[in-house]
From Swiss-Prot:
This is Catalase-peroxidase 2. Residues 1-26 form the signal peptide. The record marks 102 as: Transition state stabilizer. NCBIfam families: cat_per_HPI, PRK15061.1. Bifunctional enzyme with both catalase and broad-spectrum peroxidase activity. The active site is at residue 106. It catalyses: H2O2 + AH2 = A + 2 H2O; 2 H2O2 = O2 + 2 H2O. It comes from Shewanella sp. (strain ANA-3). There is a cross-link at residues 227-253 (Tryptophyl-tyrosyl-methioninium (Tyr-Met) (with W-105)).
Length: 739
């Protein structure tokens, strides 16, 4: 059979198997490599959302498309949608606002600080597993309600932006003044590979250490939840224990106690919970598990109407406020105006109602005007009253409505924008003017930048400063590689490597770093004193240029004359603009590019290399060439020699690959150093090299070896240098959202 006929035959087989119930497919499941070799290093994180996956093509630039959008027209359309109830999914109280607030919140609320993953950017709520999480029940309908608007504006607004904007408009349509909105969230085209936990069942919780602490980087207490179980930890209705979990999980989203209280109290001012029936008897499969005829919708409810007064979502039932479609103080007034006792929803879930039947007719029914109900609270709501810190905040907010309103506005803005990175990425006319500390502010460029002649002169001064090639490369890499593309934080801009906490990170070799920075600061000061026409250069630029001229020098010594691109314009942040605790989570526990690994790392050295490369948005070839080049440049953390497979360190040669692939070397585990390997001459037994697993994986892993062979070939030197410079420049400019 010709290979070209296989795809069409496969399509025919698929169609026939689907027609007959899928039996043929079930019998022909392919056993993949991961089954046979589960310990094999997984490179797929470096192949996510490739440009080829984007149907808009490589010439499409979302920022430009968004700038052509009439944002006011979009908001007008969204506002109209709020009260245009659809028969297939009617709105509660005649208003979709609370439903869309939940959608936006749950889109953004999966963000977590430890790895920067989650959040609204990418529009990941559309994909598995988030689109089928138990905590996201029925949000498939919210996105489907939005489709006509997304269809109308097409490529000009992403799903990520649209969901957040809709949450804002929902709040505004119910009388709340939001803090602002920024566009700029570029959509993904596939599910992001995220460690959401190892549990094999929804709502299971096997993510705590022996001390009972939630494992990093998890942001929720149970599989499939955004934060906590609203009924209490693992369903136990203990408000104080719930408060402890709330504080932990919201803290993992970068929220302090005041922001946490504002979000919960503000969010629960609107809408209601849905638990009209027992979900086990009424609700069908989630979207991912539903048939093709469901067209991406799930949780089909066979009880009653299947919606409206028969809706089943969380299993909890009722509203917190008397007017659930308006901004009021009723949530806090009710929280403190009643004593609360436990009861069960019609679905059998634990919730709280006023004691002694009080308030029984306060809350209107969402669909039947002839009915009224008592307000309800979750265990997680009662926690805001019983926990001492939360109680102080809620009582203060109750007495100061304007303070509460501003706190919720700012907390909502932070919730929905935390994963976007610095303000330089914000788009649109609704961006608030105020600079917030969690945006990692950097001063705006306020002077002319240096020109090519200045750059050349500055580079020469750096090389004449007495600093070595490895020292300059290590410092530039430490500065720039702090960037993580998951939430666009870190990077060389701002020169925060000279500030707390980065200046004392172990991976950055603080003692050497202080020496290098002192010399670079002197060069910067001398150059700035001689520049004309108001021109200046920042230390951030000097650090990057220092690494770049060092690479040029190292390439020349390897016989290749090159020019490393350099674009000035970075600025220097101050310590006051740097939240130490916020930046602390960026500290690397491992950096395979520098052969640094600490025992605090959550995975093996090779796996942590993939994680770091993924954070830097690198491809497999880019990661490979950078590791080989940085080893040749002797850029390991603290100057360790593992993996420096060359007799001329500090030279940009392809020796790492040549010597790694050399069959005259036999590798074995060191008997003296844990986690270290020794390379001995096969004939003499003489020790030639030492290495870490990160070094050796480029010869042992079949795919990485294939790339290594390209750079280790006799004609590989020039390609190696050129590719290294491209990858180096990519990392140095990873946070340059201004170019």
């Amino acid at each position: 059979m010709k290979k070209s006929t296989i795809p069409s035959m496969s399509a025919l087989t698929l169609a026939m198997s689907l027609a007959f119930g899928g039996a043929a497919i079930a019998q022909e499941q392919v056993t993949g490599n991961q089954f046979w070799w589960p310990e094999q290093l997984n490179l797929s994180p470096l192949r996510q959302n490739a440009v080829e996956s984007n149907p808009y093509g490589s010439d499409y630039h979302y920022a430009e498309a968004f700038k052509s959008l009439d944002l006011d027209a979009v908001k007008k359309d969204i506002k109209a949608l709020m009260t245009e109830s659809q028969d297939w999914w009617p709105s509660d109280y005649g208003h979709y606002g609370p439903f869309f607030i939940r959608m936006a919140w749950h889109s953004a609320g999966v963000y977590r600080i430890f790895d920067g993953r989650g959040g609204a950017a990418g529009g990941q709520q559309r994909f598995e597993p988030l689109n089928s999480w138990p905590d996201n029940v029925n949000l498939d309908k919210a996105r489907r309600l939005l489709w006509p608007i997304k269809q109308k504006y097409g490529s000009k607004i992403s799903w990520g932006d649209l969901m957040v904007l809709t949450g804002n408009v929902a709040l505004e349509s119910m009388g709340f003044k939001t803090f602002g909105f920024a566009g700029g969230r570029v959509d993904d085209w596939e599910a992001e590979q995220v460690n959401w936990g190892s549990e094999k069942a929804w709502l299971d919780s096997k993510r705590r250490n022996e001390k009972g602490e939630l494992a990093k980087p998890m942001g929720a207490t149970q599989m499939g939840l955004i934060y906590v179980n609203p009924e209490g930890p693992n369903g136990v209705p203990d408000p104080l224990a719930s408060a402890k979990e709330i504080r932990d999980t919201f803290g993992r989203m970068a929220m302090n106690d005041e922001e946490t209280v504002a979000l919960i109290a503000g969010g629960h001012t609107f809408g209601k919970a849905h638990g009209a029936h027992d979900p086990s008897k009424c609700v069908g499969a989630d979207p991912a598990a539903s048939g093709v005829e469901a067209q991406g919708l799930g949780w089909k409810n066979k009880c009653g109407k299947g919606h409206s007064e028969d809706t089943v979502t969380s299993g909890l039932e009722g509203a917190w406020s008397v007017n659930p479609t308006a901004w009021t103080m009723q949530y806090l007034e009710n929280l403190y105006g009643f004593d609360w006792v436990q009861t069960k929803s019609p679905a059998g879930h634990i919730q709280w109602i006023p004691k002694d039947g009080k308030g029984a007719n306060l809350v209107p029914d969402a669909h039947d005007k002839s009915k009224r109900h008592a307000p309800i609270m979750f265990t997680s709501d009662i926690a805001l009253k019983e926990d001492p810190s939360y109680r102080e905040i809620t009582t203060r907010f109750l007495k100061n409505p304007k303070e509460f309103e501003l706190a919720f506005a700012k907390a909502w803005f932070k919730l929905t924008h935390r994963d976007m990175g610095p303000k330089a990425r914000y788009l649109g006319a609704d961006v608030p003017a105020e600079m917030l500390i969690w945006q990692d502010p950097i001063p705006a460029l306020d002077h002319p930048v240096i020109d090519n002649a200045d750059i050349k002169a500055l580079g020469n001064k750096i090389l004449a400063s007495g600093l070595t090639v490895p020292e300059l490369v290590r410092t530039a890499w430490a500065s720039a590689s702090s960037f993580r593309g998951t939430d666009m934080r870190g990077g060389a801009n701002g020169a925060r490597i000279r500030l707390e906490p980065m200046m004392n990170w172990q991976a950055n070799n603080p003692k050497e770093l202080a020496k290098v920075l002192a010399k670079l600061e002197k060069v910067q000061k001398d150059v700035n004193s001689s520049l004309k026409g108001g021109k200046k250069v920042s230390l951030a630029d000097v650090i990057v240029l220092g690494g770049s001229v060092a690479v040029e020098k190292a390439a020349k010594e390897a016989g290749v004359t090159v020019s490393v691109p350099f674009t000035p314009g970075r600025m220097d942040a101050t310590q006051a603009q740097t939240d130490v605790s916020s930046f602390a989570v960026l500290e690397p526990t491992a950096d395979g590019f520098r052969n640094y690994y600490s025992k605090d790392s959550s995975h093996s050295p090779a796996e942590m290399l993939i994680e770091r490369a993924n954070m830097l948005n690198l491809t497999v070839p880019e990661m490979t060439v950078l590791v080989g080049g940085l080893r040749a440049l002797d850029a390991n953390s603290a100057g360790v020699k593992h993996g420096v497979f060359t007799d001329k360190p500090g030279t940009l040669s392809n020796d790492f690959f040549v010597n790694l692939l050399d069959m005259s070397t036999k590798w074995s585990k060191s008997e003296k150093q844990e986690g270290i390997y020794e390379g001995q001459d096969r004939k003499s037994g003489k020790l030639k090299w030492t290495a870490t697993p990160v070094d050796l994986v480029f010869g042992s892993h079949s795919e990485l070896r294939a790339v290594s062979e390209v750079y280790g070939a006799q004609d590989g030197q020039d390609r190696f240098v050129q590719d290294f410079i491209k990858a180096w420049n990519k990392v140095m400019n990873a946070d340059r959202f201004d170019i």
